[in-house]
């Protein structure tokens, strides 16, 4: 006799389209235990997996997720100012990505129960470029761009934009060393295997 499963499973591409997502690619899995707000402003590329207890809140902003992206369990993405995760990027467990934040200086009132005219909310888009990986329980604040190929160690606070192809760690996140680029050859091999063109790159 098979043992009963203790998980509620995943939504897949056809189901997600029926739920009203802006766009959904192929081979997409989103845990049924996720909390999703504003799915009409959320786009999912190909080969995406989002695990249990993750919050995706696009609201009136947007969350655009590329292809070959994994978002582990217990992550939180607040997309009021816009969030973009490019191809081959990933978030480990418990990462928080904020594209809007209250003013903590005491110059204004805070929290969503207060009328907006009494608040000074910072709203700015967040972008994780290709091959960015963010370690567990890290926090990314509004207006940050993490450059292509950068990696961020666990428990880091990213309050400013990070340059491509370095390893970062700390509170605030500091540059430690260059990151190896061997993964680009592996990406090219995967794309060739699947008959997909190489991505265009800026001059």
Q: What residue ranges belong to the model's regions?
A:
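Flexible, glycine/small-residue-enriched loop-and-beta-strand segment within the central core
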Residues: 10, 32-44, 49-140, 171, ...
